[in-house]
Amino acid sequence: MCGVVGISGKSSVNLRLYDALTMLQHRGQDAAGIVTESGGELHQCKGEGLARDVFRRSHMMRLVGDVGIGHVRYPTAGSSGPALAQPLYVNSPYGIFVAHNGNLTNADELRQQVFRDDLRHLNTDSDSEVLLNIFAHELQAQGKLAPSSDDIFAAVSGVHERCKGAYAVVGLIANYGMFAFRDRFGIRPLCFGKRETAKGTEYAVVSESVVLDSLGFELIRDLQPGEALFVDELGVLHLHQCAKEHQLMPCIFEHVYFARPDSLIDDISVYKCRLRMGEKLADKLIRLKPDHGIDVVIPIPDTSRVSAQALAERLGVKLREGFMKNRYIGRTFIMPGQTERKKSVRQKLNAVKLEFAGKNVLLVDDSIVRGTTSQEIIQMAR
């Protein structure tokens, strides 16, 4: 899980990219990066940590340009370290940066292909670098001195043919524009919007629609599975379906946990989805145990709160805040290591004993991944 953003604007985009990354921070806390372009020159700043810690005033002043992309990273594939911070760069052809959210399931096979057949060197164990080099090879194979939108889309089609798994990508080609594409199953989210200015139309591509709302862009729609977008150097938008076969099969965890509740993903409200999850859970509980005897419903902060509220209303019992959250601790799911996750749960949450003493309590969480959080929370509740 990562967060990506790209903006093709009519004025400086550095601060807007930074703001976008802070709004996507829940999608990754390991590293952050921004790349901008001005007059063919690419300007980059990236590093480990939260966006607020990576970017300083001096960095922002150097990130000049009207077009740029950004990334916040949670390492699902590859090790951690500053070399893995995105966007990632390849010099040939043209000079290309990409920011990738997803996982390639055939990354090991592709690494061998990239080295043996494409004659390209990979410097990290990141599957994002694999995807970048495959896109670059497919674009170079078009054999053009200056790539057109058709060349970009042909390269994306080549990626679809070779890459298996999940990928939502935004990229930047020096002197030529910004591109974005989504895997043929639409596993990871990607939407785009526009903003009218006195100088012309600006476009933004983001992981979650909430970023468009905050930056003043009008949501156009989600990129379809297999679809690609290209905004050329003149600011003209091009769209094309690049996959021969495509079907929407999104990751359910986006609506359950990853996304902010105020986002729309594939035209579905995350907030409304979580409300309905709570209602369905309540209906099942009533069906299986009508004499449940529950005194209070307590959500595990923060993602489960919407579902817990709907569940409590359906059951006709009180909703109480039984855990206080330290908001300076990150999301435990995206902590890089089991020991860190267990330690983080105790630092992150503290039980309000008054809400548990002598009561039959129903705890509501959005999901169980490793069980680390659940074990620690039950111990605290007892």
What are these regions (language model features)?
Residues 134-150, 301, 309-331:
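Amphipathic alpha-helical
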Residues 316-362, 371-375:
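Short, glycine/charge-rich flexible loops or terminal/linker lids adjacent to PRPP-binding catalytic cores
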Residues 147, 268, 272, 336, ...:
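Alpha-helix capping and helix-loop boundary segments enriched in small/acidic/polar residues
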Residues 166-167, 187, 200, 225-226, ...:
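Active-site lining segments that contact anionic ligands and/or coordinate catalytic metals
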